[in-house]
Amino acid sequence: MRVSPPSSLVRALLLGLPLVRGQATYGENYLSVSRDSEIVSRAFPELEDIELLSPAFTNPDTLPAGWRNGTEGPTSDTELDYFYRNLADRNDWLTYQAADFRSEEGRSIPYLFLSDADSTARNVTKLKVYIQAAIHGNEPAADQSVAALLGKLDRNQTFTAALLERLDIKILPRYNPDGVSYFQRALACNLDGNREHIKLARQQSRDIKQVFMDYNPHISIDMHEFTAPTIYGGNYQPGADALISGGINPNIHPDIRDLLLDGFIPFIGSNLVANGLRWEPYVTGTSNSTPGSLIKLESALEYARANFDIVLSTIESARADFISSNADIVVTDYYTRTNRTFTLVPVDFFETTPSVANLTRARPEAYLIPRTWFDVVAKLRNFGLEVQELDYEYRGTVEALNITSSVLEDVIYEGTVLNSVTTSSFEREVSLPSGSFLVSTRQKNAGLAFIALEPENIDSFVAFNIIPLERGDEYPIFRILS
């Protein structure tokens, strides 16, 4: 029997939460609820043909009291954990995996692993998919869509068997349980988990990154929900049901970017349209719904399954080509502005896929890091990079960078003051003691080293003052050229 959620619940999941109450406090940094007008609500009718088999929809009695006023999420940790454990108990293809670490406030962080034991036993080659949701605690459509996906897979075993014949799927259903508990965007420490991917300032971020890198997926999907009622130009409220983005970093292999932009994203978009939903490329300030998010998840998995050979061969060959490439790397870039129609109105749209490089540099064979900076090396290893610890004194010619300008921001951003630098390069002889480190760029995760270790990059260790520098300083990480 199909369970239809009450209309008030669906509207609630489409609520925008646009205004912060004030300066950050410890916990309870939820946002003010802004309900859509009746005119706007009528433009987002319920989708009667889509089953949402997550606890908030199948059992509305589990909704906490604070849900309607925007102070609590729709499903508690206890309720969601019970839901996933029950699914795992009755399905051999689903394994509940308790992480060996906890959130900042000590909440459990479970993973779910989906795999068909028979195809695994036959040593069938599979695509490895990673899905995470709710890195922002006040975006309920994210983890609700994951729960709805699991509910559908439990209900439709034929669909599940077809997927898992070619895919293994690891899911982090709730990245930020502390944020969900407080119904706030940030981690308990008030840093944004989605700005932690390179700087890795928090232990929870490092733990989750390690699991991701150890799994080593071919495809990763990050589920979000976007604020609905933001007004632009005085009276324009965006009307897209779903936003999709991927392949942004300019050092991503073009074949992988093309696979996303010409394959996955159009397929997902066509399925959204077929179900009566509107979609756009990602821009800030619009909405995302649980039905739309479920369709996106299903579509991504279905595209990967249906195009298994193309997807696998493209990713594997692109990885090999990236490792052996001698092309310059992109250090900084900018976005191109085009005028396009965005759900009925023309807007200036800054395209990020692809962006345009405005600073490139020869790809080094390796980065040479003095043993003094062992804490930097720990982060690099957390990225899945292989780092060699030298058991000999290193002597040789390297490319060094001198800081020619340094501009500090006048506000604190994500726990630090950002430092924008420029550099000039020169060659010099170095002598570094045994115990220093060498990071080869002939590995598939080298793109993360380019982001972190090229000082001009907006997310580099220099930008975030992990390596603090000022004008006239020599950058203490050296480049070994071909």
PLM features: what roles do these ranges have?
Residues 2-8, 19-482:
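Structured catalytic-domain cores with a bias toward divalent-metal coordination
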Residues 11-16:
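Sec-dependent N-terminal signal peptides
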